[in-house]
């Protein structure tokens, strides 16, 4: 049946029909004769009869010519005297035996309708084609299946993913293992009167493995697994979303026990009534149907819903209540142990050199998700292949880490000497500030080679994972971020635009200290603003702030005070360590890149070598 799918098949059929009709309606047309030849034959008395039809004359000769033919067709030129009068005169003069005028033959009614019917058929085929494309393609049998679910069912996949393929999420796997156990042996739970959760919501940042966990549940359970994206419900026509939800659950009930996985459920499950303008939202109708199917009047036994999102704050409360999504599993960033386990999983099949230690690599990748770590090792493998090496070494992994964090280096970009000096002192200021004030961070590399969107970078890493930050640690973050701007002011007596991203970070930290963390001396243990971390247009747009204009001015003053005090401290620290600042900048201008070990050596030996005067920047 696959050959009967698509618009091409119907176009070929239509062309064949036209060819057949043309073949059967074709007649044996007589050959043509010129008008001058006709006049010659008339003068010779060889014309028996003439039949005139508008500007075409059909003649019959007395004596055959050209393959014994006696009938010919003559096209009468429009610029000659009236052919009818000439032929009538010839008839009167006995030059021809017969002359008659005929009307054009009328084709059969079905022939005259062919162009109209053909146009209608072509338009219908084009309409079918566009509808098919808008519904995701797949052939003519899907043209009218607007309300059918787009869910893909997986049963006994040979390349299935199990919990062994998921690392760094032990607690999350334990939560989901209960679901698998219920599907395999529900009797144990039923005898105790326990009710298995109807739905499990996987929540976490992008790249932490939510979809991978769902695939692992599918592989472990050994039951039919339906997977669909939240955006697949709502498409072109009104009412299609609700219809697809009904069809999805009908299929699931027929294959129970089974699992239904809805990825990015926030595309269809967002808060109702949050649309601007108050108009009806097709998503709301789809969500209402989803709510009914999950926990309504219908019986829905043996169907477990898994869903994933990184925006739980915008989901509708009715969707999150017990009875629908009974359990919420937070898939967070992996800790150092989890990162090491993830590295072991993704390093399978990759030849590693002897100098590679996965525990050290896990230590220098705080904040990396599972997807980041996989990308890191893949980039390292690509760098190794580019260098024609047989094994992935520590050097390639380190370069890949910087590439993932900062972006690829743009060594071909031409920078003026003035810009290089500004960048060198700016990055040196960051590095010196890290060494002076931070006990938890270590400088890995200082570079003035442009990378990503930055003109240079100072890469550092925390010594350990942190769950909380104290006020002094946040002040340290501000001082480190202001190190570049302070170094510019000390060495140039002016500042540049290179600190724009640093200032944005500084202002965000200081404002959070005042409005979210209660770290202001004047305002004390109070928080201000919306409790929601992210604004959801429609729901949050009309919400007013919960403090007065006078209090807003105090908040701004407190933010400014924190930043100003930190900046003065930064300037003071760098002035006290001007020798180290100058030395590091000189080395950066010479080498363009300083690794962590060399930076430590410069920092320790700069004072011993003596002070050098601060160079004046040109331009």
From Swiss-Prot:
It is found in: Cell membrane. The active site is at residue 427. Its cofactor is Zn(2+). ATP binds at residues 204-211. It holds the Pfam family AAA_lid_3. CDD domains: RecA-like_FtsH (cd19501). GO terms for molecular function: ATP binding; ATP hydrolysis activity; ATP-dependent peptidase activity; metalloendopeptidase activity; zinc ion binding. In the central section; belongs to the AAA ATPase family. In the C-terminal section; belongs to the peptidase M41 family. Acts as a processive, ATP-dependent zinc metallopeptidase for both cytoplasmic and membrane proteins. Plays a role in the quality control of integral membrane proteins. This is ATP-dependent zinc metalloprotease FtsH. The gene is ftsH.
């Amino acid at each position: 049946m696959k050959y009967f799918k698509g618009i091409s098949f119907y176009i070929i059929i239509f062309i064949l029909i036209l060819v057949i009709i043309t073949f059967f309606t074709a007649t044996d047309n007589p050959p043509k004769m010129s008008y001058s030849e006709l006049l010659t034959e008339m003068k010779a008395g060889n014309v028996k009869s003439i039949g005139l039809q508008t500007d075409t004359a059909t003649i019959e000769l007395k004596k055959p010519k050209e393959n014994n033919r006696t009938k010919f067709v003559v096209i009468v030129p429009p610029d000659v005297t009236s052919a009818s009068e000439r032929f009538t005169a010839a008839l009167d003069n006995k030059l021809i035996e017969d002359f008659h005028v005929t009307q054009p033959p009328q084709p059969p009614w079905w022939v005259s309708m062919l162009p109209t019917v053909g146009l209608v058929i072509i338009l219908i085929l084009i309409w079918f084609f566009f509808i098919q494309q808008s519904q995701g393609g797949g052939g003519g049998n899907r043209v009218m299946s607007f309300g059918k679910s787009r869910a893909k069912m997986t049963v006994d996949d040979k390349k299935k993913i199990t919990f062994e393929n998921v690392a760094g999420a032990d607690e999350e796997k334990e939560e989901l293992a209960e679901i698998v156990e219920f599907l395999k042996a529900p009797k144990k739970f039923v005898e105790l009167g326990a009710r298995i959760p109807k739905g499990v919501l996987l929540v976490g940042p992008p790249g932490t493995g939510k979809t991978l966990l769902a695939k692992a549940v599918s592989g472990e359970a050994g039951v039919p697994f339906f997977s669909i994206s939240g955006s697949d419900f709502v498409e072109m026509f009104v009412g299609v979303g609700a219809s697809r939800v009904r069809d999805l659950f009908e299929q699931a009930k027929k294959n129970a026990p089974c699992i239904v996985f809805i990825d990015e459920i926030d595309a269809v499950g967002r808060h109702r009534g949050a649309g601007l303008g108050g108009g009806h939202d097709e998503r709301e109708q789809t969500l209402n149907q989803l709510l009914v199917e999950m926990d309504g009047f219908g019986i829905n036994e043996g169907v477990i819903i898994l869903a994933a999102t990184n925006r739980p704050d915008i989901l509708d409360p009715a969707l999150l209540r017990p009875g629908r999504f009974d359990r919420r599993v937070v898939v967070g960033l992996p800790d150092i142990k989890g990162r090491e386990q993830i590295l072991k999983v993704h390093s399978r099949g990759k030849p590693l050199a002897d100098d590679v230690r996965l525990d050290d690599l896990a230590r220098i990748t705080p904040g990396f998700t599972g997807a980041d770590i996989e990308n890191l090792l893949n980039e390292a493998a690509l760098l190794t292949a580019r260098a024609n090496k047989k094994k992935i070494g520590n050097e390639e992994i380190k370069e890949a880490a910087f590439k993932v964090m900062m972006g690829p280096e743009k060594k071909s970009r031409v920078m003026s000497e003035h810009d290089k000096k500004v960048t060198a002192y700016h990055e040196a200021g960051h590095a010196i500030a890290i060494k002076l004030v931070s006990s938890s961070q270590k400088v890995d590399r200082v570079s003035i080679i442009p990378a990503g969107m930055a003109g240079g970078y100072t890469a550092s890493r925390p010594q350990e994972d942190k769950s909380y930050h104290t006020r002094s640690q946040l002040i340290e973050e501000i001082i480190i971020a202001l190190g570049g701007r302070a170094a510019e002011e000390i060495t140039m007596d002016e500042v540049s635009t290179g600190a724009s991203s640093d200032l944005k970070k500084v202002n965000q930290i200081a404002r959070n200290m005042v409005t979210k963390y209660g770290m202001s001396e004047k305002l004390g243990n109070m928080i201000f603003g919306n409790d929601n971390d992210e604004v959801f247009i429609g729901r949050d747009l009309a919400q007013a702030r919960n403090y007065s204009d006078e209090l807003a001015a105090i908040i701004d003053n407190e933010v400014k005070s924190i930043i100003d005090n930190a900046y003065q401290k930064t300037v003071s620290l760098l002035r006290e360590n001007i020798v180290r600042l100058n030395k590091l900048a000189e080395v950066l201008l010479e080498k363009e890149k300083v690794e962590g070990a060399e930076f430590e050596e410069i920092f320790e030996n700069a004072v011993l070598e003596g002070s050098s005067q601060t160079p004046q920047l040109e331009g």
